[in-house]
Structure formats: structure tokens, C-alpha cells
Amino acid sequence: MDARRARLLLILLVLVSAVAKTALAWLQATPVYMPDEYLYSSLSRSLLESGQPLVQGGSAHFWALLVPVLEAPVWLAGSVGTAYRLIQAEQSLAISLSALPVYWLARRLRVARGRALAVAGVTLLIPDTVFSSVLLSESFALPLFLTAVCAAVAALEAGGRRRWAVFGVLALLTTAARLQFVALLPLAPAVGIVLEVRRRRFAAAARLAAPLIALVVIAAAVVTVAGVSLVAGRYGSLFSQHVGAGGLLTWTSYNGLALAFASGWVVVPAALVGLGYLTARPTSRADDAFALVTLLALLTLLVQAALFAQGGLQAMERYTFYAAPLLLVAFGVTWQRRLLERRAHAALALGLTGIGLLLPHFAEFLFSRADAAPSLLAYRALLHVMGLNAGLAFGIAAGVLGAGALVLGRRGYGNALAGFAALVGALLLGGAQFEFHDAADRTARLAGGSLSFADEAGAHDAAYLTFSDTAASDTEETAFWNRSIVEVLRLGKGVAGDGFRSPHVQPGRKGRLFVDGRPVARELVVDRTAAYARFDEPARVRTPTADLFAAGARLQELVDGFIRSGSWLATSGTFNAWPSGSAAGARGSLDLRIWGTNPLLELRGPQCNGRIAVNPEPTDVQIHFDAPGRWSCRFAVPGFGTIVGTHLVGIHAQILCFAQEPKTCPPHPGPKVGGGLELTAAP
């Protein structure tokens, strides 16, 4: 194949990939990867509107700002929906550009043009390219990382200040996209020292050691002065957890297995053979440089992923898949240099077969939490079809593919191995895309109606009022789709689970909301997923998940801990009422219908106390209250809670009526199945 035709095919490959990934991304109804997607979108909007990297009006302690800067101009497009789709298209093009540095690397290592194109094509089917449909940094970080590796190989091969400067700039840009790549800066000089020492060029090694030592000294000084937590930002907690050698080794193995799937599985033995050959018998300085850079980068990424995995107890393929294209290039070298027939490849393929057949024994553990490992998400899709047999089927398929790698390798059929790698990648990518779309569809169905309801109603500088049991993901979903929400407030116990700024609200005697002693003068978007809240005026807009109220709205009645999905009471919460109108106190009644397996609902507080028997059959309960000011009654459900979505719930409950004089609830309807009970709040 001539060079001109190869270039045209490479450009066509990038464009087809970009269009296909954009089309698939546009089928996704809403963001699914919270809080990360909300973080990046909020930073982009804030940089565009204020020039500062803020989330909910406060610092996010997040230093990798290249992607928010690149995506900020897109938010000028108009609506959130339009900007969302344009960013997905931008990311699809960016991640498709990864084929270019992969092709360059393969050609630099003297892989034939056709085979280099095949390697580039398989790269675009890596399951983790599904991240082009979500607003994360991976779509930009992958091509930047691969380009930085190209620059490192060029600098290590031929030297020169200009080449080293290009590498330094690319390494800094990659670090600005994802902070984990700060390890790139010392990586290339370290490899250079090894190369020079192997060639007994100690003076050249000393010259490379100087900038490496300078980097280490500067990094140590910054960490010493600023502290690890400040330098690491949102990842500071990672350095406070205990890391055991056993756990590190275990999770490195699991992440290595996930990376093997991400790389196409069947080509992994050939990739390892290629790396070993390039390291032990390099025919050029480029061979040596590529092999050592790849091995060192692979080790660094696996250790980073293992550190994160110990905190989340799941494979962190998000942190390792960047090495998959490098493994594919190494496979291309093995294919080109006719190393597939070697015994080393046969032995490794046999080992791959054994690992595949062992997968069913720990499939549930490995695949049960795979949100950060797209190549493992296909297992969930298989579960929908095969149920508990999915692990067995997955293991058998992996074992058969390993055996196929053994047979095809012995015959030297590299083209067939590349084809199977593309097929594995396409299937795993399709499974991951299906899971992303399914999660997005479920979220959109639960939201109901328009997701940008506040923006469409003309809201401006609104505050989002959340409660004790409001899930962070629900907050982020609503705030993402409504740019009119400029801050998030929290009423009740606890803190937001995402770590973003959310000041606590204190209601006044008449239900007016205050933050730090100042009244909230903004329009209010009020969460409905984890509380029942009624204000002194009707909502401007009402949706299944949130309501929009005019500025100055006052709380009248509140059940903090009422989980609307499935009609539940949380294991603890409060009933509250504030005096309405000109009334001096809160006087009225609350009618509940309760049922469940936990036997008791306890009421506690100076204005109420009692214990209500809970039966499996629905029971109607009427609670009267008469307080000189605000009425507040804490409730608790002793016993075991049940996890529903992200909520810990105790019993089922329906709010039949919650009203104050002059309005009244209907007379108590009398005993129901299981016995009716009337409880009057104690003064």
C-alpha cells in the first residue's frame, strides 16, 4: 500500500469513527456519570461566565482544567441540550484522533502500512472510547497521552532540545487534562537514563539525570509547602487511606485483567511477546524507547488504578485503558516481525485460556461494580439475557478466544487475530454503550417531562433546595440541565455526598429560609425526590422530581425523609409545620397511611412522642399538632433499613393530608385493615 492511499484511509477511518460515535452518543438521553459530568460541565460554564473554575459558587479544588477550557465556548450555543450534543460531537472527534499517533508509532517501529491501519482501527473500538458520550476528560486525554508518547519516543530516539521541548509541552497539556499524567514528565528522562546506561554512555545519562532530579526536587518542594491534600485537590483523600501490599497486588491484578479485555483480549499474548522482544533485542533506538516507555507507563497506570480501586472496591479501567493502544502497537510489531509462531506466544496464549476458564469463579466479584470499567460493563448486558449463567458464558468465551489466539498464533495468522480483537472490542463497546443508554433512559423516565424545566420557565439565578436524604446524583442531574440554578442549598442533617458547596438553610419562625442569617431572595427549585414540601404559594412549575417557586416563598409543611419513589419513609427524618398567614402557631393534622415489615414508627421530640405499630397491611394514622410556633417532630424506624436506589428506607408511607387551620384534613376515616390508630402530639 502506497503512502498516499494509507493517509487517505487513515483520515477516512477517523471521520467514520467520529460520525459513528457522535450518532451513538446522541442516542443517550442524559448524563449518567455523576458527579464527574456535572463537575466538568459546571467548570466549563463557570469559566465562560465568570472566568473562575467554580462549582455551585465555590471552589471545586480541581486543577486539571484543560478540558473545561476547551469545552467552555460550546456553552455559547444556547440551550443546555444543544451544548450537550455539541460537546459529545467534539469529544467523539477528539477520541477518534487517537488513531493518528497510534499509526505513527506503528510506522516508527517499521510495521507495514496496512497492518498499522489495522492497529489504528482496533484502537477506535477499545470499549473505553464509550467515554466520548459522557462529559469527561478521557476523550481529550487519550489522544494527548498517545501524542506525548510519540514525542517521548522521538526525543529518546534522536534527542535534541526541540524534541524534548515538544515532549515537555505535550506532557504538561496531558497533565492539564488528567492529573494522573503528572507522572509523564519524569517518565521519559528516566527511560533515557536507562537507554544511555545500557549503551554505557554515562555522560549522556548524567545530562538526562539533571532535569529529572530538578523535577523531583521541585515536586517535593511544592508538596512540602502546599501539602499533599492541596496539591491533589479532590483526590487528596487517596493519600490518607491505608494501602496494604496485598491489596495493592490484588487490585493491580484485577485492573490488569480489565485492561486485557480493553485491549482486545486475543492480542494480549502477542503484545507481551512484542514488548519482551523489543526490550531484549531492540533493532533500533526507537524499539528500545517505545518498549521501555510502554512498560513504565503500564506499571504506573496499574499502580494508580490499584490505589483508587482499594477505595471503591472495583476495577478502575478508567485509569489504565490509555495503555491499551500501546499494547496494540506492540501486537503490530509481533505480527510484522513474525513472532507469533514463537513458543513464548503459545505459552502466554495457553495462560490466557486458563484465566478465561477461571473467570466464572470470581466473575460476580469482578463485574458487580464495573462503573469505571467499560470493558466489563458488557457482563451486565449479558446478565439481562442469560441471568446467573452469564459468568459461565463470559468465562467460556474468554477461554475459547484464548485457545483461538494459541491456534492462530501457531499458524501466523495475525490478520485473523486483529479481526478477533476488533470483534471483541466492538462487542464490549456495544455492551458498555447499551448500559450507558439504559441508565440514561431510566434517569430520564424518572425525571419525567422537560429536564430543563426551570430554564424554560424563565428562571434566573435560582437556588436549588435539597434535603437530608436528597441523593447527590439527583441534585447534579437537575442542576446540570438548568443553568438558571446558581447555588445548591441544604435543609436538614448531613452534608452533600459530592463534596461541592451547599450551604445549610435555617427556616425562620414563619417558614422563611435563611442562609447565614440572610433571607434567601432567589427563586427556589425544590427537590421532590426525598421530601414532601408545601409552600405558602403554588409552584410555578411542577415535575416528578422538583418544583419551581417564586422568590420569597415560605415553607408551610415539610416531611424531610419522604422518599417519593415507591412511597417510603427514611429510617429517620422529621415532620415540620410553620405558622401560616397571621397565625401565631402551627395547628392542624397530618394523615399518613403506613405499612411495612419493620414493626414500629417512633415519634420523638418536645412537641410529640409516641410509638405507632406498623403492620404489613396499610394502616391509617392521624397526628394532630398544636404548637405555639413551629411544630417539629422527629421520626425513626427501629430495625433494619432497606436500600432503595440511593436511599436507606424504613417503612412504606403515603401522605394522605398535611394541613393547618383554617384548612383541615377530612375526619379520621376509622380503623383500617390491621387496626386504625389515632395519635395526638403531646404538648
List each language-model region with its residue ranges.
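Hydrophobic, aromatic-rich transmembrane alpha-helices
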Residues: 4, 257-291, 295, 327-336, ...
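Transmembrane-helix motifs of polytopic, lipid-linked glycan transferases
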Residues: 15, 89-110, 147
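Membrane-lumen/periplasm interface segments of specific transmembrane helices
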Residues: 24, 181, 185, 190-280, ...
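Short acidic/glycine- and proline-prone juxtamembrane loop motifs at membrane-interface regions
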Residues: 60, 133-141
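Membrane-interface transmembrane helices that cradle and orient dolichyl/undecaprenyl
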Residues: 109, 148-164
